């Protein structure tokens, strides 16, 4: 199965010059969704993780399914202000300003081995913030997996500089 066949490209969204890679078509197709989840699981065959973390919002869908297949728990990495219990946060830079991701203070146990999942890696800013946040909470992100990689935006190098393995199911040139 070629995961690219299930991904829709929308030009000039959310602004002119951007090619938006829409995975809702992958998620809504039973073959595409199962194939993507199975492929993400296969990327880490034999690896030892204690928990899967997924980045809001599409990382919840994929990460939850991967955690289920691996028989592991799931940690939601959320945007600021969305979690009901005590949180810790990690700020990261956007094109114009900053944002923050958060987890509950008790989400990560000391020295837990974490697999980080999201739908797409572009610049790697959000993923890097999630890695740093999990580390501050006492965990250790060993690897990250994405359905889509936009290689020219440098996200892979950003995570690899933190000694995080980066795997993706497909890549698209142009953004």
Swiss-Prot record:
Listed A to Z, the keywords are:
Cytoplasm, Glycosyltransferase, Purine salvage, Transferase
UniProt cross-references to InterPro entries, sorted A to Z? Ade_phspho_trans, PRibTrfase_dom, PRTase-like, UPRTase/APRTase
Q: Please give the Gene Ontology molecular function terms for this protein.
A: adenine binding; adenine phosphoribosyltransferase activity; AMP binding
Where exactly are the transmembrane stretches of this chain? none
- PROSITE patterns from the UniProt entry: PUR_PYR_PR_TRANSFER
- For this entry, list what GO says about its biological process: adenine salvage; AMP salvage; purine ribonucleoside salvage
What CDD domains does this protein map onto? PRTases_typeI
> According to its UniProt record, which reaction does this protein catalyse?
AMP + diphosphate = 5-phospho-alpha-D-ribose 1-diphosphate + adenine
Q: Where is the protein situated, by its record's location annotation?
A: Cytoplasm
GO terms under cellular component: cytoplasm
* Domain of life (superkingdom): Bacteria
Q: Does the keyword Transcription apply?
A: no
So, what pathway does this thing act in?
Answer: Purine metabolism; AMP biosynthesis via salvage pathway; AMP from adenine: step 1/1
Task: Briefly state the protein's biological role.
Answer: Catalyzes a salvage reaction resulting in the formation of AMP, that is energically less costly than de novo synthesis.
Q: How does it assemble?
A: Homodimer.
HAMAP family from the UniProt entry: Aden_phosphoribosyltr
The protein depicted here goes by the name: Adenine phosphoribosyltransferase
The species is Parvibaculum lavamentivorans (strain DS-1 / DSM 13023 / NCIMB 13966)
């Amino acid at each position: 199965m070629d995961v690219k066949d299930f991904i829709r490209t929308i030009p000039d969204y959310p602004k002119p010059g951007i090619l938006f890679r829409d995975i809702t078509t992958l998620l809504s197709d039973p073959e595409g969704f199962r194939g993507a989840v199975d492929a993400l699981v296969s990327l880490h065959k034999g690896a030892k993780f204690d928990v899967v973390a997924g980045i809001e919002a599409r990382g919840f869908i994929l990460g939850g399914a991967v955690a289920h297949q691996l028989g592991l728990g799931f940690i939601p990495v959320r945007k600021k202000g969305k979690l009901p219990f005590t949180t810790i946060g990690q700020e990261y830079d956007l094109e114009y300003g900053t944002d923050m991701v958060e987890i509950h203070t008790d989400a990560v146990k000391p020295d837990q081995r974490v697999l980080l999942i999201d739908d797409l890696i572009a610049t790697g800013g959000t993923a890097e913030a999630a890695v740093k946040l999990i580390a501050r909470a006492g965990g250790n992100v060993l690897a990250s997996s994405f359905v889509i990689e936009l290689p020219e935006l440098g996200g892979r190098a950003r995570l690899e500089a933190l000694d995080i393995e980066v795997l993706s199911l497909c890549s698209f040139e142009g953004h």
